[in-house]
Amino acid sequence: MAAPPASSSAREEFVYLAKLAEQAERYEEMVEFMEKVAEAVDKDELTVEERNLLSVAYKNVIGARRASWRIISSIEQKEESRGNDDHVTTIRDYRSKIESELSKICDGILKLLDTRLVPASANGDSKVFYLKMKGDYHRYLAEFKTGQERKDAAEHTLTAYKAAQDIANAELAPTHPIRLGLALNFSVFYYEILNSPDRACNLAKQAFDEAIAELDTLGEESYKDSTLIMQLLRDNLTLWTSDMQDESPEEIKEAAAPKPAEEQKEI
């Protein structure tokens, strides 16, 4: 990676540092650098490169903790089934620590989205990008929150995804990677959080079918990204329809919890 020019602005310097942090897999610092970029642009929009760097930074920071939470929750269930109450108490305390970290990360990006990124977005793809991101981080909260907090997080997720979907359907082609990525994550939300496999499958299938119908219009630039997400949509559809065939409608309706999050494909 070449050194930044000596005359580079603070904004360019932080972008460069974020790229260095990404290469070094120091994602917490990458988040800090990209937050500084967002502060430096004031009311202007981030460039496509900058918003992608911000997304990658937060996705890695949150992704590590989501994976940790799933592992600890799985261990907790096993210890509960064995009646190891002392271990369960220790595990719950540890899970609570991870949940505090998850909450802090989500609160940080959601505040940035609400105060800067969403209000500054001027075109269709950036609006959908940020509203999808807003939905994603509310969804991550809904994964581990309980009671009213979970209900609130789910409602915020639905509101953000629907707002993004309205703009995407009006302004982005069915093959646009951002529109496809929204459909992918929105369908995962229906399946995992709202426990609605029918709606999840309908949304994923519609997005896939609409994109297939216009596949020949795809430019070389976005072909790889779009077809990758289409494959993920198809993977989820295969998994979900298989699950639904294994259960009667009554069992699906009354199911207390969805399949583990790691089985679903999202971006």
Swiss-Prot record:
Pfam families assigned to the protein according to its UniProt record, in alphabetical order: 14-3-3
Keyword field: Acetylation, Cytoplasm, Nucleus, Phosphoprotein
Chain segments carrying region Disordered: 244-267
Segments of skewed composition (Basic and acidic residues): 250-267
Leader peptide range in chain numbering: none
Modified residues (Phosphothreonine): 217
InterPro entries: 14-3-3 (IPR000308), 14-3-3_CS (IPR023409), 14-3-3_dom_sf (IPR036815), 14-3-3_domain (IPR023410)
Recorded GO CC terms: cytoplasm; nucleus
Superkingdom, natural source: Eukaryota
Residues found modified as N-acetylalanine: 2
Compartments it resides in: Nucleus; Cytoplasm
Modified residues (Phosphoserine): 73, 196, 248
Keyword Chloroplast attributed: no
Subunit details: Interacts with FD. Interacts with CINV1.
Described purpose of this protein according to its UniProt entry: Is associated with a DNA binding complex that binds to the G box, a well-characterized cis-acting DNA regulatory element found in plant genes.
Family to which the UniProt record says this protein belongs: Belongs to the 14-3-3 family.
Protein name: 14-3-3-like protein GF14 phi
Name of the gene encoding the protein in the UniProt record: GRF4
